[in-house]
Protein backbone atom coordinates (compact mmCIF):
# COMPACT_ATOMS: atom_id res chain seq x y z
CA UNK A 1 0.00 0.00 0.00
CA UNK A 2 1.34 3.44 -0.87
CA UNK A 3 1.16 6.38 1.49
CA UNK A 4 -1.09 9.27 0.50
CA UNK A 5 0.57 12.62 0.05
CA UNK A 6 -0.62 15.15 2.63
CA UNK A 7 -1.05 18.75 1.45
CA UNK A 8 -2.24 21.79 3.36
CA UNK A 9 -5.72 23.24 2.97
CA UNK A 10 -4.59 25.71 0.33
CA UNK A 11 -4.47 22.76 -2.09
CA UNK A 12 -8.28 22.59 -1.92
CA UNK A 13 -8.75 26.37 -2.05
CA UNK A 14 -9.58 26.60 -5.76
CA UNK A 15 -12.07 23.75 -5.63
CA UNK A 16 -13.77 25.20 -2.53
CA UNK A 17 -13.94 28.63 -4.19
CA UNK A 18 -15.55 27.07 -7.26
CA UNK A 19 -18.13 25.20 -5.16
CA UNK A 20 -19.01 27.84 -2.55
CA UNK A 21 -18.21 31.09 -4.40
CA UNK A 22 -16.02 32.44 -1.59
CA UNK A 23 -12.42 31.87 -0.53
CA UNK A 24 -12.66 29.41 2.36
CA UNK A 25 -8.93 29.05 3.07
CA UNK A 26 -9.08 31.61 5.90
CA UNK A 27 -12.43 30.31 7.22
CA UNK A 28 -12.28 28.69 10.66
CA UNK A 29 -13.48 25.09 10.74
CA UNK A 30 -14.36 23.28 13.98
CA UNK A 31 -13.65 19.54 14.09
CA UNK A 32 -16.62 17.41 15.08
CA UNK A 33 -14.24 14.84 16.56
CA UNK A 34 -11.90 16.74 18.87
CA UNK A 35 -13.30 20.29 18.78
CA UNK A 36 -10.09 21.83 17.42
CA UNK A 37 -10.60 25.09 15.51
CA UNK A 38 -8.32 25.70 12.52
CA UNK A 39 -8.42 27.75 9.36
CA UNK A 40 -9.13 25.58 6.33
CA UNK A 41 -5.64 26.46 5.00
CA UNK A 42 -4.11 24.68 8.02
CA UNK A 43 -6.06 21.43 7.62
CA UNK A 44 -4.64 18.28 6.00
CA UNK A 45 -5.77 17.58 2.43
CA UNK A 46 -5.51 14.24 0.65
CA UNK A 47 -5.97 14.26 -3.12
CA UNK A 48 -4.62 10.77 -3.93
CA UNK A 49 -8.01 9.16 -3.29
CA UNK A 50 -11.39 9.08 -4.98
CA UNK A 51 -12.10 12.77 -4.54
CA UNK A 52 -10.64 15.23 -2.07
CA UNK A 53 -10.53 14.44 1.65
CA UNK A 54 -9.90 17.18 4.22
CA UNK A 55 -8.91 15.99 7.71
CA UNK A 56 -8.31 17.54 11.10
CA UNK A 57 -4.57 17.91 11.66
CA UNK A 58 -5.04 17.18 15.39
CA UNK A 59 -7.11 13.96 15.42
CA UNK A 60 -7.26 13.00 11.69
CA UNK A 61 -11.07 13.07 11.71
CA UNK A 62 -12.48 13.40 8.17
CA UNK A 63 -14.02 16.88 8.06
CA UNK A 64 -14.94 17.39 4.41
CA UNK A 65 -15.13 15.00 1.47
CA UNK A 66 -15.64 16.23 -2.10
CA UNK A 67 -16.22 13.83 -4.98
CA UNK A 68 -16.77 15.08 -8.53
CA UNK A 69 -18.66 13.10 -11.12
CA UNK A 70 -19.33 13.87 -14.76
CA UNK A 71 -22.58 15.72 -14.05
CA UNK A 72 -22.59 16.48 -10.31
CA UNK A 73 -20.46 17.00 -7.22
CA UNK A 74 -21.00 15.45 -3.79
CA UNK A 75 -19.89 17.44 -0.72
CA UNK A 76 -19.97 15.86 2.74
CA UNK A 77 -19.39 18.22 5.69
CA UNK A 78 -20.49 15.70 8.34
CA UNK A 79 -17.15 15.72 10.17
CA UNK A 80 -17.32 19.43 10.92
CA UNK A 81 -19.04 21.00 13.88
CA UNK A 82 -19.00 24.32 12.06
CA UNK A 83 -17.49 26.30 9.21
CA UNK A 84 -17.42 30.07 9.72
CA UNK A 85 -17.94 32.13 6.59
CA UNK A 86 -17.06 35.80 6.86
Residue ranges of each PLM-predicted region?
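Cys/His-rich zinc-coordinating "finger" modules and their low-complexity flanking regions
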Residues: 2-4
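Short Cys/His-rich Zn2+-coordinating modules
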Residues: 8-21, 36-42
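Short cysteine-rich clusters marking metal-coordination/redox-active sites
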Residues: 31-34, 56-59
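Short Cys/His-rich "knuckle" micro-motifs
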Residues: 38-45, 66-69
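Short linker/helix segments within small regulatory modules
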Residues: 44-53
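Short metal-binding segments enriched for Cys and/or His
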Residues: 58-74, 85
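Extended interfacial segments that mediate partner engagement and assembly in macromolecular machines
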Residues: 80-86
Amino acid sequence: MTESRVLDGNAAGGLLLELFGVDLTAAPCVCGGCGAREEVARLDVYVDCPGVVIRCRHCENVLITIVRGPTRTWVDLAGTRGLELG
